[in-house]
């Protein structure tokens, strides 16, 4: 009996200490540290930013410093990185975002391109071609075309 009372008491104390140290660590950081990586390059490496808006599977989310830790699957769409009054927008084909308790955000994506690098005319042509390939008799080609259509339609809606 005494052992269970001591065990519960120690457990409560450890929980309080853990919560308290988390709160102090969160208060100590001033901004969100962003790691934005692709397989072939790193776009941001521990850079301090104001906010990052993400196209998550659960809906669009905005991440600020001291955000609740989470892991999100990212859909094709725009990642907006806000640095003070400046904003940079990247179109990603998908990926993952992990928010750490110490105001760190790690975004990993297969591809990411600045929005200004896209041409509406090019997207329109690629989308028409992909839509033709969706009805292909080759199952693999049809599946790849369906993915292209999803990504290109998202990109086209962002560029309008």
Swiss-Prot record:
InterPro entries referenced in this protein's UniProt entry, alphabetically: ATP_synth_F1_dsu/esu, ATP_synth_F1_dsu/esu_N, ATPD_C_fung, ATPsynth_dsu/esu_N
Cell location: Mitochondrion; Mitochondrion inner membrane
MF terms in GO: proton-transporting ATP synthase activity, rotational mechanism
Primary location: mitochondrion
UniProt GO BP: proton motive force-driven ATP synthesis
Transit peptide: 1-22
Span of the signal peptide: none
Keyword vocabulary terms for this entry: ATP synthesis, CF(1), Hydrogen ion transport, Ion transport, Membrane, Mitochondrion, Mitochondrion inner membrane, Transit peptide, Transport
Gene Ontology, cellular component aspect: mitochondrial inner membrane; mitochondrion; proton-transporting ATP synthase complex
CDD domains, alphabetized: F1-ATPase_delta
Assembly, per entry: F-type ATPases have 2 components, CF(1) - the catalytic core - and CF(0) - the membrane proton channel. CF(1) has five subunits: alpha(3), beta(3), gamma(1), delta(1), epsilon(1). CF(0) has three main subunits: a, b and c.
HAMAP family: ATP_synth_epsil_bac (MF_00530)
Protein family membership: Belongs to the ATPase epsilon chain family.
Function: Mitochondrial membrane ATP synthase (F(1)F(0) ATP synthase or Complex V) produces ATP from ADP in the presence of a proton gradient across the membrane which is generated by electron transport complexes of the respiratory chain. F-type ATPases consist of two structural domains, F(1) - containing the extramembraneous catalytic core, and F(0) - containing the membrane proton channel, linked together by a central stalk and a peripheral stalk. During catalysis, ATP turnover in the catalytic domain of F(1) is coupled via a rotary mechanism of the central stalk subunits to proton translocation.
Name of the protein: ATP synthase subunit delta, mitochondrial
Protein source organism: Saccharomyces cerevisiae (strain ATCC 204508 / S288c) (Baker's yeast)
Gene name of this polypeptide: ATP16
